[in-house]
Amino acid sequence: MVKIQNYGTGRRKSSSARVFLRSGDGEITVNKRSLKDYFGRETSCMVVRQPLELVDMMNNFNIYITVKGGGVSGQAGAIRQGITRALIKYNHLLRSELRKSGFVTRDSRQVERKKVGFRKSRKRTQFSKR
Protein backbone atom coordinates (compact mmCIF):
# COMPACT_ATOMS: atom_id res chain seq x y z
CA MET A 1 0.00 0.00 0.00
CA VAL A 2 1.40 3.39 -1.05
CA LYS A 3 1.02 6.23 1.44
CA ILE A 4 0.58 9.63 -0.18
CA GLN A 5 2.38 12.35 1.72
CA ASN A 6 3.47 15.93 1.17
CA TYR A 7 6.83 17.20 2.39
CA GLY A 8 7.94 20.67 3.46
CA THR A 9 11.12 22.11 4.96
CA GLY A 10 11.07 25.08 7.32
CA ARG A 11 13.85 27.15 8.86
CA ARG A 12 13.92 29.88 11.50
CA LYS A 13 16.95 31.26 13.39
CA SER A 14 19.18 28.18 13.81
CA SER A 15 16.33 25.62 13.69
CA SER A 16 15.35 23.46 10.76
CA ALA A 17 12.26 21.28 10.51
CA ARG A 18 11.22 18.49 8.15
CA VAL A 19 7.43 18.15 7.90
CA PHE A 20 5.45 15.24 6.42
CA LEU A 21 1.69 15.65 5.83
CA ARG A 22 -0.34 12.46 5.55
CA SER A 23 -4.12 12.15 5.45
CA GLY A 24 -5.50 11.44 8.90
CA ASP A 25 -7.40 12.83 11.87
CA GLY A 26 -5.28 15.81 12.98
CA GLU A 27 -2.55 14.21 15.07
CA ILE A 28 0.70 16.23 15.22
CA THR A 29 3.89 14.36 16.21
CA VAL A 30 7.18 16.21 16.83
CA ASN A 31 10.34 14.07 17.20
CA LYS A 32 8.16 11.02 18.08
CA ARG A 33 6.33 12.96 20.83
CA SER A 34 2.95 14.68 20.78
CA LEU A 35 2.88 18.43 20.14
CA LYS A 36 1.73 19.19 23.70
CA ASP A 37 4.47 17.01 25.25
CA TYR A 38 7.23 18.43 23.06
CA PHE A 39 6.54 22.15 23.51
CA GLY A 40 4.53 22.35 26.73
CA ARG A 41 3.82 26.08 26.25
CA GLU A 42 0.51 26.82 24.55
CA THR A 43 1.94 29.78 22.59
CA SER A 44 4.38 27.53 20.70
CA CYS A 45 1.59 25.03 19.97
CA MET A 46 -0.57 27.88 18.62
CA VAL A 47 2.25 29.04 16.30
CA VAL A 48 2.56 25.50 14.91
CA ARG A 49 -1.21 25.21 14.28
CA GLN A 50 -1.64 28.68 12.66
CA PRO A 51 -1.38 27.65 8.97
CA LEU A 52 -3.77 24.71 9.46
CA GLU A 53 -6.35 26.88 11.23
CA LEU A 54 -6.08 29.55 8.53
CA VAL A 55 -6.99 27.14 5.71
CA ASP A 56 -9.42 25.19 7.97
CA MET A 57 -7.66 21.81 7.66
CA MET A 58 -6.96 21.03 11.33
CA ASN A 59 -8.45 17.52 11.23
CA ASN A 60 -7.52 16.54 7.65
CA PHE A 61 -3.90 15.49 8.20
CA ASN A 62 -1.60 13.58 10.50
CA ILE A 63 1.65 15.54 10.65
CA TYR A 64 5.03 13.97 11.38
CA ILE A 65 7.84 16.42 12.15
CA THR A 66 11.54 16.15 12.88
CA VAL A 67 13.16 19.35 14.10
CA LYS A 68 16.76 20.13 15.05
CA GLY A 69 18.67 23.10 16.45
CA GLY A 70 17.73 26.33 18.16
CA GLY A 71 15.28 26.94 20.96
CA VAL A 72 11.54 26.64 21.46
CA SER A 73 10.53 29.78 19.55
CA GLY A 74 12.81 29.08 16.58
CA GLN A 75 11.66 25.48 16.33
CA ALA A 76 7.98 26.50 16.40
CA GLY A 77 8.61 29.03 13.61
CA ALA A 78 10.51 26.46 11.55
CA ILE A 79 7.67 23.94 11.92
CA ARG A 80 5.12 26.60 10.91
CA GLN A 81 7.02 27.33 7.70
CA GLY A 82 7.43 23.60 6.98
CA ILE A 83 3.70 22.97 7.39
CA THR A 84 2.97 25.95 5.13
CA ARG A 85 5.23 24.61 2.36
CA ALA A 86 3.74 21.13 2.65
CA LEU A 87 0.20 22.57 2.40
CA ILE A 88 1.22 24.48 -0.75
CA LYS A 89 2.49 21.22 -2.29
CA TYR A 90 -0.82 19.59 -1.33
CA ASN A 91 -2.88 22.38 -2.95
CA HIS A 92 -1.16 25.30 -4.73
CA LEU A 93 -4.35 27.41 -4.52
CA LEU A 94 -3.72 27.87 -0.77
CA ARG A 95 -0.52 29.83 -1.49
CA SER A 96 -2.12 33.29 -1.84
CA GLU A 97 -4.07 32.95 1.42
CA LEU A 98 -0.99 31.73 3.31
CA ARG A 99 1.19 34.47 1.81
CA LYS A 100 -1.22 37.21 2.97
CA SER A 101 -0.75 35.98 6.54
CA GLY A 102 3.04 35.97 6.11
CA PHE A 103 3.63 32.24 6.57
CA VAL A 104 5.34 31.60 3.21
CA THR A 105 8.19 34.10 3.67
CA ARG A 106 11.28 32.92 5.57
CA ASP A 107 12.05 35.16 8.56
CA SER A 108 15.71 35.88 7.80
CA ARG A 109 16.56 37.59 11.10
CA GLN A 110 19.57 36.02 12.81
CA VAL A 111 21.30 36.74 16.11
CA GLU A 112 23.87 39.50 15.66
CA ARG A 113 27.36 38.45 16.68
CA LYS A 114 29.14 39.84 19.73
CA LYS A 115 31.87 42.36 18.88
CA VAL A 116 35.27 42.69 20.53
CA GLY A 117 35.35 45.36 23.24
CA PHE A 118 31.56 45.30 23.67
CA ARG A 119 29.59 43.45 26.35
CA LYS A 120 27.04 42.14 23.81
CA SER A 121 26.53 42.80 20.11
CA ARG A 122 25.82 46.52 20.66
CA LYS A 123 25.98 47.10 24.41
CA ARG A 124 29.14 48.85 25.54
CA THR A 125 30.73 49.68 28.84
CA GLN A 126 29.74 53.09 30.21
CA PHE A 127 31.65 55.94 28.57
CA SER A 128 33.81 58.01 30.91
CA LYS A 129 35.04 61.37 29.64
CA ARG A 130 37.79 61.65 32.29
Swiss-Prot record:
Belongs to the universal ribosomal protein uS9 family. Residues 105-115 have a biased composition (Basic and acidic residues). Gene3D superfamilies: 3.30.230.10. It comes from Buchnera aphidicola subsp. Schizaphis graminum (strain Sg). Keywords: Ribonucleoprotein, Ribosomal protein. Pfam families: Ribosomal_S9. Residues 116-130 have a biased composition (Basic residues). It comes from the Bacteria. This is Small ribosomal subunit protein uS9. Residues 105-130 are annotated as: Disordered. The keyword Ribonucleoprotein applies. PROSITE patterns: RIBOSOMAL_S9 (PS00360). The gene is rpsI. HAMAP family: Ribosomal_uS9_B. InterPro entries: Ribosomal_Su5_D2-typ_SF, Ribosomal_uS9, Ribosomal_uS9_bac/plastid, Ribosomal_uS9_CS, Ribsml_uS5_D2-typ_fold_subgr. GO terms for molecular function: RNA binding; structural constituent of ribosome.
